[in-house]
Amino acid sequence: VRNNPGRCPGLRASALSGRVSLRKFNKKDMTKGFVHSVESFGSVDGPGIRFLIFLQGCPMRCQFCHNPDSWKTGIGEERTADELLDQAERFRAYWGDKGGITVSGGEALLQIDFLLELFEKAKQRGIGTCLDTSAQLFTRKAPFFEKFERLMELTDTVLLDIKHIDDEEHRKLTRHSNANILDCARYLSEIDKPVWIRHVLIPGITDKDEYLVRLRDFLSTLHNIERIEVLPYHTLGVYKYDKLGIDYPLKDVQPPAAERVANANDILQQAL
């Protein structure tokens, strides 16, 4: 999930349904992944300098999403793991000891089989791996959980996006419960996987002290958090909704004041 404007290759309004299935990415198709875009030089999406790979498709419909062009499944540029890694390694000289690749979306876990192949081959090349996810697809049930366990063996750092700590408010904001997202956070703590928490601060929605305190208290129960990032809500992706001819849900919401961002940081950093 980026905090910068992405590209808009074009998305039909019919693509905005919240019904997304992992079945679209079945095993026979896993030699290639559906890629939304790549960026060669990322400095905020994981440790060090990163080559960023944004996979296509997302089950969430976050009201503040600035990349609705990444929602639809089964579209995008089809790339193999080796093609992406060959491209990434052109920039390896910039990575230093901490850099590598970060895979985001959309929601990267929608293409977990391709992601497994990509990270497996990255490790064979000695490339550091980072996963940026909302974890909405997480479950401890088969077959997903066995794949996720293996994925975590291949993942150095997880950037976990927690949209809202309150389940009812989370449903309003994203059309989905946060129960499995919070369970994923617990699981990552259980296996001691390094995690960066990301939380978008939206005036009137996620910036209430009550919710920030609840989020802080939840994060305080985890033992693997390396960083907590408060991302101020912005409107940089509104033009995409205009191009699509659909209403932007938060058109009357302005970015948070600096004081509210500082307040959120003061509260959430107490969890570290």
Give, region by region, the residue ranges found by the protein language model.
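Auxiliary Fe-S-binding modules of radical SAM enzymes
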Residues: 24-44, 196, 201-272
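N-terminal polybasic/positive-inside topogenic patches
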Residues: 15-24
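Short glycine-enriched, charge-decorated loop/helix-capping segments at active-site entrances
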Residues: 69-73, 171-177, 245-253
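Conserved alpha-helical substructure of the radical SAM core
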Residues: 68-101
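Canonical Radical SAM [4Fe-4S] cluster-binding loop centered on the CxxxCxxC motif
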Residues: 31, 37-79
